[in-house]
Amino acid sequence: MEMASGGGAAAAAGGGVGGSGGGGGGGDEHRQLHGLKFGKKIYFEDAAAAAGGGGTGSGSGSASAAPPSSSSKAAGGGRGGGGKNKGKGVAAAAPPPPPPPPRCQVEGCGADLSGIKNYYCRHKVCFMHSKAPRVVVAGLEQRFCQQCSRFHLLPEFDQGKRSCRRRLAGHNERRRRPQTPLASRYGRLAASVGEHRRFRSFTLDFSYPRVPSSVRNAWPAIQPGDRISGGIQWHRNVAPHGHSSAVAGYGANTYSGQGSSSSGPPVFAGPNLPPGGCLAGVGAATDSSCALSLLSTQPWDTTTHSAAASHNQAAAMSTTTSFDGNPVAPSAMAGSYMAPSPWTGSRGHEGGGRSVAHQLPHEVSLDEVHPGPSHHAHFSGELELALQGNGPAPAPRIDPGSGSTFDQTSNTMDWSL
């Protein structure tokens, strides 16, 4: 009984120990979790050994639990020490010193430029020395150029222009640059337009001549039987076969071209004056090319006359006059070209295609009659141009002592020497 009781006590004691061991095991689990938290490896003994020696287990548990605490303290101390070291390193690094303020680079000045404009701070010159005529920089006499913002030697600087010579040379080169091709093209175009306008006005003025009435009234009237300069006397006779003149409304006018040195000045006599007989070009310029270009260059087709051509010829012949001295109206002059005459023959209205200028060789301007001291007159210029369509014909010349007659029936002129 005693042994049993003793065994029970021992068992109780063992249970107590086991309880304590179980309690220690519960603490070990907590410590194991804590050890796992800090990364420590935990080795488990055999179950028998753990059951046989709870104290040993508890001792081992305490021993295993001790290192994590120490390690945790060491880790905590290490973190704390590291923090302290880091703080000491930041406090030890001093901030960089501020840059020195910009100062004037002129010797003897050294003015602080931190409170003025950025232009002077960038070029390191004060306001006073930027305009000074002479300063010393780097041991040399120079002057600050505000055009290029640099210091130049005195020979390189123009005191009058207040600029360096290199800058002035570039400025003058830009000013003397030649004009662009576009501007020169516009200038030539404007000049050509002006020339064209002047040429057009010139053409209009000479294409439509206008003779004032005062000049027309000032022309001397030539009466039948009057003697004009050069000794040419005009006679007006009515021929039996004469056609009525559409110009002045009178009968046909005749003139004689016979004369000699003994009988006096030559007097023209001949057949009837054709209806178109008039003096063209009176009061015109001495150059007969204008009158010829207006009268003879344009061919007139009598079968296909237009009103416009008649109007142009009437305007061109507005300054003509008949042989008897009366001014001729343009409409009557245009009608006279349409009238038949012995000069044109029967082909005047039927031939068609021959110009009136070729059919009227008698038309002579006053400018073509050249009086001389020997009282002779000759036809030139217009007579040759009028006959050039039918072939070359020599210009008739009437000299003193020679006569010429015109045969109306055969339409031929005989010249006697």
Curated annotation (Swiss-Prot):
UniProt keyword annotation of Transcription present: yes
Induction: Negatively regulated by microRNA miR156.
Mapped zinc finger ranges (SBP-type): 101-178
Region (Disordered): 1-32, 51-102, 387-417
One GO cellular component term: nucleus
Subcellular location: Nucleus
Residues annotated as binding Zn(2+) 2: C145, C148, H152, C164
Keyword ATP-binding belongs to the record: no
Expression tissues: Expressed in young panicles. Expressed in the shoot apex at both the vegetative and reproductive stages. Highly expressed in the promordia of primary and secondary branches. Highly expressed in young panicles.
Keywords: DNA-binding, Metal-binding, Nucleus, Phosphoprotein, Transcription, Transcription regulation, Ubl conjugation, Zinc, Zinc-finger
Residues recorded with modification Phosphoserine: S163
Pfam entry (one): SBP
A GO biological process held by the record: positive regulation of defense response to bacterium
Residue ranges annotated as motif Bipartite nuclear localization signal: 161-177
Biased composition (Polar residues): 402-417
Binding partners and assembly: Interacts with PCF1 and PCF2. Interacts with IPI1. Interacts with D53. Interacts with SLR1. Interacts (via C-terminus) with SHI1.
Free-text comment on this protein's domains from its UniProt entry: The SBP-type zinc finger is required for the binding to DNA.
Stated name of the protein: Squamosa promoter-binding-like protein 14
Organism: Oryza sativa subsp. japonica
Gene this protein is translated from: SPL14
